[in-house]
Amino acid sequence: MDSSIPDIPDDSLGLGAGGAQASSSACCAKRVNKRRAAPDFDDDDDGSKLFRCDDDGGGGDKERFARENHSEIERRRRNKMTAYITELSDMVPTCSALARKPDKLTILRMAVSHMKSLRGSGNTAADGTYKPSFLTDQELKHLILEAADGFLFVVSCESGRVVYVSDSLTPVLNQSQSDWLGSSLYDQLHPDDGDKLREQLSTAESNNTGRMLDLKTGTVKKEGQQSSVRMCMGARRSFICRMRCGSCPVEPMSMNRLNFLRSRNRNGLGPPKDGEPQYVVVHCTGYIKSWPPTGVNLTDEEADNILGSRYCLVAIGRLQVTSCPSDTDMNSISVPVEFISRHNCQGLFTFVDHRCMATVGYQPQELLGKNILELAHPEDQELLRDSFQQVVKLKGQVLSVMFRFLSKTRDWLWIRTSSFTFQNPFSEEIEYIICTNANVKQLQQQQAELGGGGRDGLYEAGQVTLPQMPVQAVTAAGTDHSKTMDKAEMHPSMYPNPDQAKFLPSTSAPGVPIYPQDNNNYTTANRSNDTYSRSVGMAPQMVQPSHSAGQVLAQMSRQNGAPPSNSSPLQGGAAVSWPGPAAGARPPFNNQQVVPQAGKALSPQFAMGSFVGGSSSSFGAMPTTAAPTPTMGANYPNINPRATLNTNGYDGLGSGQQFPSRAVEAVWPQWQGQQQAQNRAEQHPHTQNNQPDIFPDVLAMLDQPANFNNDDFEIPIYPSFNE
């Protein structure tokens, strides 16, 4: 026992240090195990909690899912709002111009400011109606009345008295404003329509409340039973009645053609009886409004005039235009007098307006593909062909010509055609020619019936009647195709009687034919060698100058004592026989078109043959190689360009008083420096560089030397024209 007892302490003593270490390590291990066991305990605890929740029926899980769904919905809503505000920020210029992205409130504030600026300040009325800021109330009223083609009136609902009426009442009903203002609307209506007006002016409830007449379908529609609300915002009214037509005169010039025809084309109820007023059908549309309007204070006199009315009818009255005019004179006025056609450069119809049926009698399909020259008079075909060639060269400018057109009834109608070309804006090539063809006779009749107010004076009254058509101006030009033909001169061969004047005024004697009728040997072969071309005869309504520059200079020469030259085409001497005045008198000048170009035919290289023998009806030799253009009964000697040059009066060696080329334009010295280079390139066969001075006093006033050159005054004003 003793041996065993000490052995135990000895072992324990021998293992003292190691045992201490072991015990300490055991303690550490126990602490570590406790730390590690804690998570296990927690996990178990969590698991036990979950299990306990499951055991409780899953109420907490539903709450958690509900919270998650609500958060997702809110997140989506915030994302959408952010996207819309970002898009709004991009649309507002003030927001997009900022350096940094503004917050949401700033974006909304700037958007509201931008919308107000677009809408305009102060344009919104109390009832929410909108009016553009750039229009005044008066301008807006006129625009509305013009668009509605009617008149505006305001009527008191209780008394039926007219409180206001616009000035457009006069062209619609031929009554003045004073006839309506202050009067009863019942007096202006047909007696049988009084009950209808009383029903429309009534503001009380009725069985027909909310019923509207639809004019398009002819049915009665019901708008609903919101009478109290509609009365506050304005109850709509629409009805048809018969109104009395007055006798106040209407000035046609103050109205356009459409309004004038519509006022003439009233839907009358048959011819009025003697002593009875005439009534027309008027469609009235408007609203019942409170009177006086909110915020408007009336004077005592105005308050007495409305007789205590609380409501008024604000309406627009428009004429019911019938499809069958009742007026007999409308049958002639409504007939079309013109139609539009489209042609190619050769004159073929590519499009025809439907009004051609009433104007010339043809259906559009009958004219398509045909050449307009085929329907023109044989004597006018060359004139029309030249007009098409000229309008092509004018490139967009309007050219007017009058010719005879073969109608469907095989009658010749005088047609005035105003044509211009349409160019491709990219290639600048001519696509087609657009013509407006007007029947002159129908146009004059319609202008007479309209009292001169139709067409806004497009065709002036200065044009002559059909049997007295004046001779159109035709010129003679040389081989120089770089200059435009003169439209103010006439070729002598165009007159059937060579004793007539070379230049005729615009009011020539009636019955003068434009082309020779008999003994016309002007063949195609001769035409091919003829270097003289005829320009397009313009319409008589072209603007005409009062005096030409040639007349002014001729008058100055007579005052200075310059002797007239008998060989000059501008002066009449003993060798020329004029039909009207005595020998030695000056012929009248043609004041029609392009007067500044009248001096072009005066140059010696373009000289016409001189007139020899007052009654011999013979012409001198032409100083060119052109084929002669015969006239009726005229004898022509053989052409010798140089042998008979002395008979022309323009020979530079034998003539003392001569007209230089472009003497008429000598009053424009500032242009001569610009034209020298161009005119030196124009080589004429008989150019005379040194000619005597004609108007020394004129040149002295213009500070010009006495010796000048023809080429100084060659001014190509108009584009070139080649036959």
Curated annotation (Swiss-Prot):
Residues covered by the PAC domain: 400-443
The keyword Nucleus is annotated on this UniProt entry: yes
One GO BP annotation of this record: positive regulation of transcription by RNA polymerase II
Biased composition (Polar residues): 557-570
A Pfam family hit: PAS_11
Principal location: nucleus
Keyword annotations from UniProtKB, A to Z: Activator, DNA-binding, Nucleus, Repeat, Repressor, Transcription, Transcription regulation
Any one GO molecular function term: protein heterodimerization activity
GO cellular component annotations of the record: cytoplasm; nuclear aryl hydrocarbon receptor complex; nucleus; transcription regulator complex
Entry annotated with the keyword DNA-binding: yes
CDD domains from the UniProt entry: bHLH-PAS_ARNT, PAS
Tissues expressing the protein: In day 23 embryos, expressed at highest levels in brain, spinal cord and epithelial cells of developing gill. Expressed at higher levels throughout all tissues in day 27 and 35 sac fry, predominantly in brain and spinal cord. In the adult, isoform 1 is widely expressed (at protein level) and is detected in liver, gill, gonad, brain, kidney, heart, spleen and muscle. Isoform 2 is expressed (at protein level) only in gills with highest expression in the epithelial cells surrounding the gill lamellae.
Domain-level remarks: The C-terminal region of isoform 1 contains a transactivation domain. The Pro/Ser/Thr-rich region in the C-terminus of isoform 2 inhibits DNA-binding of ARNT-AHR dimers.
Name of protein: Aryl hydrocarbon receptor nuclear translocator
Organism: Oncorhynchus mykiss (Rainbow trout)
Lineage start: Eukaryota, Metazoa, Chordata, Craniata, Vertebrata
